[in-house]
């Protein structure tokens, strides 16, 4: 079942010899759940809540439950191509909703429980979602938006014991013949960060899971092995939590631990890792930094076999701490929702260079290029392009064909990242061509934040950038030109911060605000964020060298 030949211990040989074999028909629900259900005792998921309530689910149970919910959705009229939005944390219903949607040939739409009303409204309206499954505060926000969303026909409450998720599921039949989807059929829409204008919905095909797997296997040091069990603190609403942890682990029939407990607590996470004997993890650098403060992890019982990290640069100090504290090399990985899991490390068979992105994983081709689309020699800095003849490449942006075309240069996809290749084939990240902010593992688009701040009557102009931060990699910083009649104050700053926090998401609000007289603009009136970033780096004593 592994795509990587574990008998070959040479990374470059694995790259040379790899060939994709993508079937014409492929359905993620069948691949990650139903085919494992023959073994009725095979565990798929452990769940735990903040109150200590624990549950265990087998693949056989997930198959039956997702069949029942798929039939319930079908009775509501959900059919091939319809969008089913899921606004839930790490709980079993999240996985069941995705599986059920895929079995119907529908498109699942994962959305963060941290999204405020504006962020939810935009994504639900843009996608034309017909059904939303949610719980708690997110459910209340969706209910309030229903009058503004003509395509939204049904909102399902996971916690309503009378008419909610579980009663609906019980009414559905356990028998279902899943739609025979083609590998190129859409499975997911995941909204990416918008650098100019609103976020864009990246349409992910069923085959993209297969394209993930060479990188997943190698970043988890030849996954799967006996006793492997996967966990991540990353929200299952994002590519990282869903497609880099939950779904690929299920593809191999391995159990996953899900925790629905709110804000990340490093000490609690370490105890949970020990208690469930977690062996594999995707842990963003910010979470690793917080775990570093806990103390002797191995004394707590933490015994990880492999860790992948992504979302921001890991750095040499954090890598060396992990080597000492965990006894393993952290495998840094780089990817995007549009073109995921393409670059990274495998400490099992290759030297890891702290600070490097690693190498292109088997089956993926990445090249630094100049502005004319010509490949650059070793050591020369250019934009990183990925070859589009790759099963992991997405289908395009939802209803944005022109914006998809603009990211293509012939057979190459523009990643927007600037970097170079060294003489040993390692790729090094230099900066971003675009203005996406990387904070605590989240990719945050400044456009949505700026639009939100401009709704405040005091804000005349606004620009958001990433400001260097030791813990989070970057924090959101806003530069604001005030409208006439308003004066800068601590109270006004907090008011604007709360506007973003409540309208968008808690991780998107500007932790720092600087009131300025004007913003640097191009001749066409666009904000020069690069100038603001350079100014901020100088202020914090950093250089661009």
Regions found by a protein language model. Name each.
Residues 55-60, 187-214:
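Conserved AMP-binding A3 loop
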Residues 251, 278-282, 292-352, 365, ...:
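Gly/Ser/Thr-rich phosphate-binding loop
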Residues 502-526, 545:
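AMP-binding/adenylate-forming catalytic domain of the ANL superfamily
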């Amino acid at each position: 079942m592994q795509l990587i030949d574990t008998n070959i211990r040479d990374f470059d040989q694995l790259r040379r010899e790899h060939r994709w074999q993508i079937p014409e028909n492929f359905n993620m629900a069948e691949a990650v759940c139903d085919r494992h259900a023959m073994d009725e005792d095979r565990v798929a998921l452990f769940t735990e809540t903040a109150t200590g309530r624990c549950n265990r689910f087998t693949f056989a149970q997930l198959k039956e439950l997702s069949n029942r919910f798929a039939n319930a959705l079908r009775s509501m009229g959900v059919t091939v191509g319809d969008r089913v939005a899921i606004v839930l944390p790490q709980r079993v219903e999240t996985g069941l909703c995705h599986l059920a949607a895929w079995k119907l040939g529908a498109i699942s739409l994962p959305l963060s429980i941290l999204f405020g009303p504006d962020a939810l409204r935009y994504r639900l309206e843009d996608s034309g979602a017909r059904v939303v499954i949610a719980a708690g505060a997110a459910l209340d926000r969706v209910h309030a938006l229903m009058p503004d969303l003509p395509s939204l026909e049904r909102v399902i409450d996971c916690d309503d014991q009378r008419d909610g998720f579980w009663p609906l599921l019980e009414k559905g039949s356990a028998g279902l013949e899943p739609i025979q989807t083609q590998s190129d059929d859409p499975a997911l829409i995941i909204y990416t960060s918008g650098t100019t204008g609103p976020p864009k919905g990246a349409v992910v095909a069923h085959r993209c899971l297969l394209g993930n797997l060479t990188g997943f296997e190698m970043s988890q040091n030849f996954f799967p092995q006996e006793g492997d069990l996967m966990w991540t603190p990353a929200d299952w609403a994002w590519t990282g939590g869903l497609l880099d942890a939950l779904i690929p682990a299920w593809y191999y029939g391995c159990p996953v631990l899900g925790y629905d407990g709110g804000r990340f607590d490093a000490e609690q996470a370490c105890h949970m890792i020990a208690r469930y004997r977690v062996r594999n993890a995707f842990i963003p650098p910010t979470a690793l930094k917080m775990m570093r403060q806990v103390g002797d992890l191995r004394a707590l019982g933490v015994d990880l076999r492999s860790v992948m990290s992504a979302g921001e640069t890991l750095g040499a100090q954090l890598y060396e701490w992990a080597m000492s504290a965990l006894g393993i090399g952290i495998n840094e990985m780089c990817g995007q929702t549009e073109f995921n899991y393409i670059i990274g490390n495998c400490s099992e068979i290759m030297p890891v260079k702290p600070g490097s992105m690693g190498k292109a994983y088997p089956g993926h081709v990445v090249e630094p290029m100049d502005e004319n689309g010509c490949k650059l020699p070793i050591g020369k800095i250019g934009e990183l392009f990925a070859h589009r003849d790759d099963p992991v490449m997405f289908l395009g942006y939802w209803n944005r064909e022109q914006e998809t075309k603009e990211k293509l240069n012939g057979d190459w996809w523009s990643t927007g990242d600037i970097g170079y290749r060294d003489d040993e084939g390692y790729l090094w990240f230099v900066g971003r061509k675009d203005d996406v902010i990387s904070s605590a593992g989240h990719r945050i688009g400044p456009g949505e934040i700026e639009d939100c701040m401009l709704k405040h009557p005091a804000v005349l102009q606004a620009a958001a950038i990433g400001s260097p931060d030791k813990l989070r990699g970057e924090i959101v910083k806003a530069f604001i030109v005030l409208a006439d009649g308003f004066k800068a104050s601590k109270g006004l700053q907090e008011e604007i911060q709360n506007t973003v926090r409540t309208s968008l998401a808690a991780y998107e609000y500007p932790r720092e605000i600087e009131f300025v007289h004007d913003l640097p603009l191009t001749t066409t009136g666009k904000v020069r964020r690069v100038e603001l970033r350079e100014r901020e780096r100088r202020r914090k004593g950093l250089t661009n060298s």
